[in-house]
């Protein structure tokens, strides 16, 4: 079968003259005497020029099997040889009238008089090409990533949600979608997130982890969950993919944020003195009249309204709607006879609020992106939740019912004290049998950010959930807490323990010491904090109204997003450890300082000036008292009928 093609006709027969085949496929041309003695052969075959004069050159140079040396071991062809070759195999004889052959001695061959060049380096493999680069100086503190070598095969589970073949097919598609995003990130020019480019082993591990999580958490709807995930992956932008990779690396290897920087935050500079900023703050005050429908309380509920609210609670027999999952359950303030506080068992929910991606002009081609929960990246409607709580919880928002638990109080006038400096405060709340109650209160001075008050608060109802993921308050904080003393420092004690007061009313009384009715009280979504403390204050500055959402109230911009956008600062980065109320209060105050600087640029261009601690309008302009506040429509979008022609 090989004879007509002659594929091996130029290859010397391994058996040489001892070959017993009548029609051997190898060459049996006479060999030169130099090949008779193998000890003289120390090089590879070099084809002479005369051997190819009568025909075209071959496509590839063929190498003979390396002969054995005197020691009996074959010399490796892969090892470069730098010394001169003493002798070479004889060239193929040129067919003629006889069996004569033309040969050239070693001294006549060009290849015998020069050194053999070393072999060319092989190209990098794909695994090496896409391996994560060395950590930068800022990431040198991170532990090395040691991804296990796993095959792309679904992990064994005690109760598999689907057949192995189905899981393997789904896993393959999931891995392919991740590889496409990883390749896209690797090709991104000028990328500063090179450590986020995963190696092949890390990609396999990430795909296995996600498939296993879906199989364990949602076995009944496993196929739907994972298929929606596969469809969603190609629609992710690079920024969204980077966030998912960071979350995976943090959970799998680092246990901290990969991009976390230990450098201190830059100090905010507005170019204004504290007195000037306080003077300009009077232009940022928002009247609350007309905002009652969005949760702002401007008057105390009457006794009749409070009694009606209590009667309604009594007739409902404790039935409430869960603030997390939306289910109905029954709550028992003071505990039921068997000691239970609620019914309904565990609560399955999503701790994060749903995120609705902004629309793009290409949505009619690529399709609109699905809304999802940032806590687990699941699309809305995929599952009932990714987190389980021990009990259901509820929240009370109606002012009349809030007053039935603890009545609202207006900020009192303190005749023995003069004007007070603006105060920025933040509250943390937890769930009890009476709803969402105050459990921590922090107040700082504005604009210096000096701590005035930081205390824990014992709620009035039995605690159902401290909401530690957001409040940052854990049971051990109450265990270590010490009773509040007015003579002690407002900060924590040396062992990290906070001071605690016995009720929300006591915490409210402490906050009133720093306020007058005309003292600007600053907060983010301040209606929630005021309602938790049961305070009615006429002079407020709310960053929700200073930085309104494009679609207006009741939609609000989050504090974390505003701080990142206007201050280039990262807050609320502790994950499951919760928020820091002091950090949030200072960040809220800095947002007001930024707005004050912007407002001063506008006022200065119109001729306004600052004398002492007061704003002086230009001649002929409206007085400061008439134009010192935001309009009543601040914070919410106007209707078309309200727009002037």
Swiss-Prot record:
Residues in Exonuclease domain copies: 421-601
Domain of life of the organism encoding this protein: Eukaryota
GO BP annotations, alphabetical order: rRNA 3'-end processing
EC number: 3.1.-.-
SMART domains membership: EXOIII
GO cellular component, as recorded: cytoplasm; nucleus
Protein function: 3' to 5' exoribonuclease required for proper 3' end maturation of MRP RNA and of the U5L snRNA.
InterPro entries named among the record's database cross-references: Exonuclease_RNaseT/DNA_pol3, REX1-like_exo, REXO1/3/4-like, RNaseH-like_sf, RNaseH_sf
Top enzyme class: hydrolase
UniProt gene name: rex3
Full protein name: RNA exonuclease 3
Localization per Swiss-Prot or TrEMBL: Cytoplasm; Nucleus
Main location per the UniProt record: cytoplasm
Gene Ontology terms, MF aspect: exonuclease activity; nucleic acid binding
Residue ranges with Polar residues bias: 99-124
Family to which this protein belongs: Belongs to the REXO1/REXO3 family.
Entry keywords, A to Z: Cytoplasm, Exonuclease, Hydrolase, Nuclease, Nucleus, rRNA processing
Species in which this protein is naturally found: Aspergillus fumigatus (strain ATCC MYA-4609 / CBS 101355 / FGSC A1100 / Af293)
